[in-house]
Structure formats: C-alpha cells, structure tokens
C-alpha cells in the first residue's frame, strides 16, 4: 500500500485535551478527524493552535476576524510543509480558499462543505472558483446539486460521501432479534434545524411516552438548547447528556423521531444514523438534506415537513407493527456496518487524497 500523503488537517474548534483518553475508555464515540489523522499521518491544528501561534498575523486575524480566520491563515502559512490541506468545514474552508487563491496555491485543498445553500455562501463560493480545490466533500445529494448546478463547481471535484459515525460505540446492547421493538418510549434527539413544535403537536394526541434530548451534539459544544419543545404529561425533555446516557436512551427506545425543517443540508442526519446504528427504525421529516439516508418503508417512515398529523400516524404505525419495526431496525444496523461509519469515510478520504 502506498504511503499516504502528509496532510495538515484544520479543525475549526478546540479539541479537548483528554478526548483520546475518553474515547479509549469507551466514554465517547470515535471522531472522524482523529481517525483521519491516524490513517493519513496528518497533523491537526485547531483553535488551540491559533491561540498558541507565534505568528503575530495569525493572532491578529483571530482577534479581529475570528478564530476560523486565524486558523485559515495558520494553514496558509504552513502550506509548503504538506502535500495536502484538509479542512473539516466551510467555516475555515472558505477563508482558506480566499488565502490560497491569492497565493496561487492550487489543487491541493480538500474541504468538507456541510451547507453551501445560503445567499452569502453561494455568492462567495461562485466568486472564488474551483482552482484551489483538490476536492469538495458534501454529505447529501441536495448539497451536491447546489455546489455543481448553482455554485458552478466542476462535478468531478465535488465528492458526495456518507456521514461518518462510530458504529462500534453505537451498537445494540442486546441480540438483534431482542432489541429493535423492545422499548417502551419514543426518542427524539438533536438541535440543528429541528421542528419540535410539530413533534409536540403529534405527541399530544398519542398515548406513548416521549423522551426528547433537545440540545447540540456534545455536552461540551456550548450550543444553546433547542426551543419549541416543552415537557408535558407524556413528554420528558433532557439536555446536554453524556454520550453514554444518550446511547442508553437509544438502546431503550422503540423508535426514533427526527423532526426537521425544510433545509437542503443534512440537518438531523447524525441522530438518524446513530439511531440506525442502534438498530432502531426512524420517523423523519422529508427534508431534502436527509433523503439520502432514510428510505421510506425500508429504514423508517418519511413524513411531510411540518405535518403533525402525518408524523402522528407514522409513529403509531411503527409502534403498532413490532415485526415491521424489527425488520427496519435490522436493515438499518446492517447498512450502518456496511456504509455509514467512520471507517468507511476515512478510507474514502484516504483514497481521494492518495490521488492528489
């Protein structure tokens, strides 16, 4: 096997000092950027690196323009040390493209773009062109269309991949035949672009217990808790749970509901994939950004965005059909093991950068 190229990985957040220890102890799932760094022989720079930089320009950019700009400038300054740059998101990727374009450093940046579909980002990405990129990774067909058809990037440079997640951490605690339809509550999770008022309206007319974890992806992420959902007679709301507790809730539920607004990016997909990894069927709003991940009638049920009646009916149908729910859960676990996992994503990126 050829030696992977040396890569500088730009992570647009602060990496916790004890993260690897917590992962090794089984307290948290593996994260894709650590797995990528191991596989590619990459060096990671993050917001801690910006704050510790000896470069006055980097520290000035961070103070005046924000940490993402400081990180982009740090990456641009160190570009000649590496065969390739990889940016984990558009928050650092777009500033980095601006700098690399000015420096005439072409074809050696790969960036993950989660959401290109805002007026400002469409204009910026269109104006910046494509020469800086080796590749642009997106996570849904809807985003691929935005990047190719609206922004105008060459289709050959836009690579649609599946979301990554740790399928070893998120796995059923019981044998497959015992787990999928055994729960006694409905679980809903997440914050990004959630439509909790629709779920609240659906739950109000159902006799089942609902457990809602209404906050961001991590207890240390610093996100504001999601609004639009209130505890009630059959609704329990929790926020900012440790990963082990979240996994317990997945394991004990009968099905998972992911109500989202109509958006073109993959809002809700992390929760959907975690639920699938745990062998659970999913009810989800048919938002364009998640249609790649839920096949109606096979992996779960898709309902029109904002339709509380349809959501209520889909939840009841799965609850009342344990055999069907069990089959969906088995299908979902198999699919995750085959395609929707960190190992698969890392190998795809390694092959992609191996052609740089």
Label each PLM-derived region with a short phrase.
Residues 178-211:
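Conserved donor-binding/catalytic core segment of Leloir-type glycosyltransferases
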